[in-house]
Amino acid sequence: MKKLALLVSGSGTNMQAIMDACASGEINGRIAVVISSNHEAYALVRAEGAKIPNYVCCKKDYPSAEARDREILRLLKMYDVDYVIL
């Protein structure tokens, strides 16, 4: 089973479709982590409800784009993801 990371910024309707496909076996994987660029993204609520680890990496919270990118990479490595889905 592959570990997926989802990068989200909005309501999470695509994320919900992926969650459903994983649950039904249509996708042989599980969502290991959700990373949002938006503190207000409803996708974070969906992730919380499904007990999926989730983080916000908003560019205003970092001194540079490179610092934010390093944090995203750190999270991807921490969860040992196989695929990143945008």
Where are these regions (language model features)?
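One-carbon transfer enzymes
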Residues: M1-L86
